[in-house]
Amino acid sequence: RFSMWGSVGLSISISIGYDNFKKFLIGAEKMDIHFKESPIEKNIPICLALIGIWNSNFLGSHTQGIIPYTEYLNLLPSYLQQSMMESNGKNIDRSGKKINYSTGNIIWGGTGTNTQHAFFQLIHQGDKLIPCDFIGFKKSLHGNKDSHNKLMSNYVGQMQALMKGRSLKEVVSEMVSKNIDEETINKNANFKVFDGNKPTTSILIDQLNPESLGMLISMYEHIVFTKGVIWNIFSFDQWGVELGKVLASKLLTEIE
């Protein structure tokens, strides 16, 4: 979960070059310093951790979507699954007692507009509360402003729809303005209603590069740590994977 900053980072350095890897580390260090020195009300990881705890422990959400609006981060949701779920998926507190409150959430997601045609139906009109992190970038990597502007319009538009929704009155008014007959309005209007008031977090970054990626990953690590402290759990063990491995070892002998 956290090995990329140490010796395992050698493979990253070989892949992207040492100069880029150094920028990656510099970005992570900047977020480390921000987390250590910034006051709580301006501390990004702490504020996001508190928002997550509010959504989970007070609003009853048990899941979180990670939606980066760039295909370059298509593996980020999978990475954060391990980082968040293995770290905080615990039901025993630091004193060894059973916990009677919700801790680690189910983490999942996908990239940009692809996910809009995959699972956004459930987020918009389903009966489950699914807070989402929307990760966007102000500047395109390749200078294609037209494509990037379309991407960003979807980035903002989806969050606006989740926040504001659309009332029955608004739906009917729009259908009337399009000269749709009353029978069709009565038949279809309710299907077009969006409740809104769905929690989202907008994480807007200037441009995707090694430094900003280092800051982003470090930010999520500090969110994990902060939640673990508040929930009074050990975020850096993984007892939950042990039993399956022990049983698998015994079963392998029998299978062979």
Please place each PLM-identified region on the residue numbering.
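Active-site phosphate/pyrophosphate-binding segments
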Residues: 1-144, 196, 245-247, 252, ...
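Helicase-primase coupling helices
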Residues: 102-207
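Short, flexible segments with low predicted structural confidence
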Residues: 55-56, 184, 215-217
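Short alpha-helices
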Residues: 1-26, 195-239
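Charged, low-complexity, helix-prone segments enriched in Lys/Glu/Asp/Gln
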Residues: 31, 51-55, 80, 148-167, ...
